[in-house]
Amino acid sequence: MVKVVNSSGKHKTATARATVMKGTGKVRINKIPLELYTPELAMMKISEPLLIAGNDVVSGLDINVDVRGGGIIGQANAVRTAVARGIVEWTNDTAIRDNFAAYDRNLLVSDSRQKESKNFGGPGARAKYQKSYR
């Protein structure tokens, strides 16, 4: 039986589901290879857990990620969390887990912060409409 690990990551309204399996080192996000993923900043954010884990670990894995919702950077953060969790679960290596935690805790723990909702009396969550006294 083929070993397959499923993991997920969230950031704001973006949700990513990663599937990690034995392979040749291919990483795909929504069926697009990581090397072709745009913008470059998002691609660099997603590649962080791959660089920290090391080429010897990642070269033997295929990682397919499906991400929905949110914006570009929110999706990138959700993907990097899902990928990091998948690698940790696949390897069962505490050293890799510790390296991820030391670099950025959000690689393993989803960022639960949400947008503050708009309130009455103003255009946004905190701002108020201008008041005239005369």
Swiss-Prot record:
Residues 114-134 are annotated as: Disordered. Keywords: Ribonucleoprotein, Ribosomal protein. GO terms for molecular function: RNA binding; structural constituent of ribosome. Disulfide bonds: none annotated. One of its GO terms (biological process) is translation. Gene3D superfamilies: 3.30.230.10. InterPro entries: Ribosomal_Su5_D2-typ_SF, Ribosomal_uS9, Ribosomal_uS9_archaeal, Ribosomal_uS9_CS, Ribsml_uS5_D2-typ_fold_subgr. GO terms for cellular component: cytosolic small ribosomal subunit. PANTHER family: RIBOSOMAL PROTEIN S16 (PTHR21569:SF16), RIBOSOMAL PROTEIN S9 (PTHR21569). Belongs to the universal ribosomal protein uS9 family. This is Small ribosomal subunit protein uS9. The gene is rps9.
